[in-house]
Amino acid sequence: MELCFNEMTVMKNGALPEDIALCAQAGFSAVELRKGTLLRYLRGGGTLEALRQTLEEQHVRAASLNALESVSFQTKAGGRMLRELSEWCFAACRVLGCDCMEVIASFHVPEGTSATAICRETADSLLRLSDAAADYGVRLALEFMAVPGSSVRTFAQCAEILDTVDRANVGMLLDTWHFCAGGSRPEELSALRGDRLFMVHVSDCPARAPFTAQRAESYWPGEGDAPLEELLRSVRATGYDGPCSVEVMDPNVLALPAGDAIRRAAETMKPLLARVER
């Protein structure tokens, strides 16, 4: 599997194109670009073409652009804004040589909406985005999130939505923190095809009852209680051989200088992947 770094981990102190050089120095071959950081770079006078050149010079590929948020249960005006933003993001992906975009379902669902209705609405929204993304050669990776308000909270729910969509360019983003925090188990992955899994985020999680962990309790691999080695072995058994991207939301980590955080991410992730791939 591919060693990848997620810019969310340095969202406070990171910057482009500097993060890319730091990732290369630490041994990462891929990076997930954060939309907000990318926009800040462009507003400061940078260009997509120059950023792609930096990626190529540093031998780091853009594995994903993150994220399109609240893609479901949109108002008419919100839907129009989402279409405009998604078209820009997909076009940016093409320039950057990036073939994947993270998508997140809505956190604002009408009270009393059934699980079946959430599945159908989310699937319909993904189908519309899928058509637009396909024109740019972009895949959509739906992330389930085991946090309050999320309309897609579990691995099983996400898998059901993907079965409903059934498109080659729509798959899953599996975050080990959300997987464990939502009470999912490694054996559940046996039903998942590797080609349905587009991205894996890795961070550690404390032992908590399902849906009670706080997002700030997202730690470096090996500093929590999640069975990360077992979980990543189960991921690998599906046939997945793509990016394993370090994303840590601990406020102490977010406060670190970008270089320190990127080096620490490599130090904790490299041994874990080595054990998984023995």
Where are these regions (language model features)?
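Catalytic-core regions built around general acid/base machinery
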Residues: T47-Q58, S125-A132, E188, E230-S234
